[in-house]
């Protein structure tokens, strides 16, 4: 079974554990996901079955949009509502002041990923090491904030909707935001509502060709695709180097053109 859809991962489960429940639900062991959410976070997770598990690298998965609740005045080792070490009653902020900081934190931001993150360290998730008390040195990174808006402010809780680049950590955004206010803050909730064009719609099966980040190409002799025969650049409509998809009635293939040579990256992937 070939299938790709946006699932909704609940809070409290790792992405791997959630995938295991979907494998049982759909009775299919060949499954995968893209865009790991750590156990604290909930929301959209791109899931694929069958041959479609090979398509993740071709999908357009950015920008990503999240809803987050910042709990102002709270210090947590994990920058969420676990591992809380201190809660302070702080004065309420004026909304224009909060908006000013939101506006300042647009564009490219430098940060260090949090210890409690889904980033891998020698094959192990950072949050798994952090739970064991193992400190790791995470390299500084950059993320791009495309948009951020305040949804509501009911002190000490600030609700925002933020759209960011791939690889961004909302925990780190929260930490930097709080630093500009001169306080501590942590997340009390985090939900991914959109990943590229993927939004949750009851696990509805999607037409993957509408979600891959490739241009179409065309060939007159479609039998070549059916048989996996060698393709020459001259037989294609577009000759520029790069990756393309070519579709037939029942299948599609992904090819690469480089130095006037055509190479199959994936061939005869059955449409769902």
Swiss-Prot record:
EC number(s) given by UniProt: 5.4.99.25
Catalysis performed (reactions): uridine(55) in tRNA = pseudouridine(55) in tRNA
Pfam families on file: TruB_N
Function: Responsible for synthesis of pseudouridine from uracil-55 in the psi GC loop of transfer RNAs.
NCBIfam families named in the record: TruB
Family listed: Belongs to the pseudouridine synthase TruB family. Type 1 subfamily.
UniProt-recorded name of the protein: tRNA pseudouridine synthase B
Provenance organism: Campylobacter jejuni subsp. jejuni serotype O:2 (strain ATCC 700819 / NCTC 11168)
Highest classification ranks of the organism: Bacteria, Pseudomonadati, Campylobacterota, Epsilonproteobacteria, Campylobacterales
Designated gene of the protein: truB
